[in-house]
Amino acid sequence: MTSNNPNQPVSYPIFTVRWLSVHALAVPTVFFIGAISAMQFIQR
């Protein structure tokens, strides 16, 4: 984060495992929060 080198191959491929783990948790979480909040309005 503090390094200003765009060609830093130390931990650069974060879109392989970290991207999958973040989106595998974030996408269903946003979907379930939207679905649960929608159920709160259609129930009454």
Curated annotation (Swiss-Prot):
<keyword id="KW-0472">Membrane</keyword>
<dbReference type="Pfam" id="PF00283">
    <property type="entry name" value="Cytochrom_B559"/>
</dbReference>
<dbReference type="GO" id="GO:0009539">
    <property type="term" value="C:photosystem II reaction center"/>
</dbReference>
<keyword id="KW-0479">Metal-binding</keyword>
<keyword id="KW-0408">Iron</keyword>
<comment type="subunit">
    <text>Heterodimer of an alpha subunit and a beta subunit. PSII is composed of 1 copy each of membrane proteins PsbA, PsbB, PsbC, PsbD, PsbE, PsbF, PsbH, PsbI, PsbJ, PsbK, PsbL, PsbM, PsbT, PsbX, PsbY, PsbZ, Psb30/Ycf12, peripheral proteins PsbO, CyanoQ (PsbQ), PsbU, PsbV and a large number of cofactors. It forms dimeric complexes.</text>
</comment>
<keyword id="KW-0793">Thylakoid</keyword>
<dbReference type="GO" id="GO:0005506">
    <property type="term" value="F:iron ion binding"/>
</dbReference>
<protein>
    <recommendedName>
        <fullName>Cytochrome b559 subunit beta</fullName>
    </recommendedName>
</protein>
<keyword id="KW-1133">Transmembrane helix</keyword>
<dbReference type="GO" id="GO:0009055">
    <property type="term" value="F:electron transfer activity"/>
</dbReference>
<dbReference type="InterPro" id="IPR006241">
    <property type="entry name" value="PSII_cyt_b559_bsu"/>
</dbReference>
<comment type="similarity">
    <text>Belongs to the PsbE/PsbF family.</text>
</comment>
<keyword id="KW-0813">Transport</keyword>
<keyword id="KW-0349">Heme</keyword>
<keyword id="KW-0604">Photosystem II</keyword>
<keyword id="KW-0812">Transmembrane</keyword>
<comment type="function">
    <text>This b-type cytochrome is tightly associated with the reaction center of photosystem II (PSII). PSII is a light-driven water:plastoquinone oxidoreductase that uses light energy to abstract electrons from H(2)O, generating O(2) and a proton gradient subsequently used for ATP formation. It consists of a core antenna complex that captures photons, and an electron transfer chain that converts photonic excitation into a charge separation.</text>
</comment>
<dbReference type="GO" id="GO:0009767">
    <property type="term" value="P:photosynthetic electron transport chain"/>
</dbReference>
<dbReference type="GO" id="GO:0031676">
    <property type="term" value="C:plasma membrane-derived thylakoid membrane"/>
</dbReference>
<feature type="transmembrane region" description="Helical">
    <location>
        <begin position="19"/>
        <end position="35"/>
    </location>
</feature>
<keyword id="KW-0602">Photosynthesis</keyword>
<dbReference type="InterPro" id="IPR013081">
    <property type="entry name" value="PSII_cyt_b559_N"/>
</dbReference>
<dbReference type="InterPro" id="IPR006216">
    <property type="entry name" value="PSII_cyt_b559_CS"/>
</dbReference>
<dbReference type="GO" id="GO:0020037">
    <property type="term" value="F:heme binding"/>
</dbReference>
<keyword id="KW-0249">Electron transport</keyword>
<feature type="binding site" description="axial binding residue">
    <location>
        <position position="23"/>
    </location>
    <ligand>
        <name>heme</name>
    </ligand>
</feature>
